[in-house]
Swiss-Prot record:
The gene is menG. GO terms for biological process: menaquinone biosynthetic process; methylation. This is Demethylmenaquinone methyltransferase. Belongs to the class I-like SAM-binding methyltransferase superfamily. MenG/UbiE family. GO terms for molecular function: demethylmenaquinone methyltransferase activity.
Length: 254
C-alpha cells in the first residue's frame, strides 16, 4: 500500500484515501476513541444550520458529516476528489434511504430532512458557480491539500455574501502535558493501532506526520483571514486536539 508524502501531491492523496475508504469510519472511531462524533456535532453547530440552507461539504469522504447536516434540514453537496470515498458514501446513502423507506435518486439520497448530493471535485478548483452556497465546510481535509490558502479562497468564492465557513481540523493541545502525551501517541501508538484496524496502516503514518506539521490555532486563523474571510474565530475541542474555526464571507448581514 502506498501513502502520500507531505508534499501532498493530489494523485497520491486521492489514491491513499481510495485505499482506506472501506474501513475509514470504523478506523477513525477507534483512533479517536469515539470523539469523532463530538467533533462532527461541534462543526454542525458552528454552521448554524437551518432547513433549506445550501451547504457544501468539501473533503466529505464517506458523507458521514453531510448526512448529519442534511438531518438538520439543509440541502448538502458532499464533494471529494477520492472516487473510492464517494463510492462508499453512495453505498451508505443508499442504505440510509432503504432503511427510511425512501428511494435514493441518482447521486443523492433523502436523509429524513434535507438532501445529500455527491460530487467529484478538487478543493483547489471547485466545480461550482460563485455564491452558490449559504454554508461551506471542510473537516480534516484542509491539512491534505497542497495549497490551503487556495482552497480557502475557493471556498470563499462559492459562498454567498454573509455565508459561513467552518473548518474542523486537528490542532495543538493547549495544555503542555496533554500536548506532549498527544504527540507521543501520534508517533508511537497511532501507527500500531492503525495496523490492527485499518486496511492501509501506512496511510495513518502520513496522518501522524501531517498533524505534527500542521500549524496551530492562531496561525490557521490568520491564513483564513488572509484568504478574505472575516469574523474569524475558533473553538478548541478535546483540549485543543481538534479546533473548529468559524468565519464569515464579508458583504452580507449575517
Amino acid at each position: 500500500m502506498s501513502r502520500a508524502g507531505l508534499d501532498k501531491k493530489p494523485d497520491q492523496v486521492a489514491a491513499m484515501f481510495d485505499q482506506v475508504a472501506r474501513r475509514y469510519d470504523v478506523t477513525n472511531a477507534v483512533l479517536s476513541a469515539g470523539l469523532d462524533r463530538t467533533w462532527r456535532t461541534a462543526t454542525a453547530r458552528a454552521l448554524a444550520l437551518a432547513p433549506g440552507l445550501r451547504v457544501l461539504d468539501v473533503a466529505a469522504g464517506t458523507a458521514t458529516s453531510s448526512r448529519a447536516f442534511a438531518a438538520a434540514g439543509a440541502d448538502v453537496v458532499a464533494c471529494d476528489f477520492s472516487l473510492g470515498m464517494l463510492a462508499q458514501a453512495r453505498r451508505r446513502l443508499a442504505d440510509a434511504a432503504a432503511r427510511a423507506g425512501a428511494g435514493a435518486g441518482t447521486g443523492g439520497a433523502g436523509t429524513g430532512g434535507g438532501r445529500v448530493l455527491l460530487a467529484a471535485g478538487d478543493g483547489l478548483r471547485l466545480p461550482f458557480a460563485d455564491g452558490s452556497f449559504d454554508r461551506v465546510t471542510i473537516s480534516f481535509g484542509l491539512r491534505n491539500v497542497a495549497e490551503g490558502d487556495v482552497c480557502l479562497a475557493e471556498l470563499l468564492r462559492v459562498t454567498r455574501p454573509g455565508g459561513v465557513l467552518a473548518v474542523c481540523e486537528f490542532s495543538r493541545p493547549v495544555w503542555r502535558p496533554v500536548r506532549t502525551a498527544y504527540m507521543e501517541y501520534l508517533m508511537r501508538a497511532l501507527p500500531a493501532v492503525a495496523r490492527a484496524v485499518s486496511s492501509s496502516p501506512d496511510s495513518y503514518v502520513y496522518l501522524a506526520e501531517s498533524i505534527r506539521a500542521w500549524p496551530g490555532q492562531a496561525a490557521l486563523a490568520e491564513t483564513i483571514r488572509a484568504a478574505g474571510w472575516t469574523r474569524v474565530g475558533w473553538r478548541n475541542l478535546s483540549g485543543g486536539i481538534v479546533a473548529v474555526h468559524r468565519a464569515v464571507r464579508p458583504g452580507g448581514d449575517d
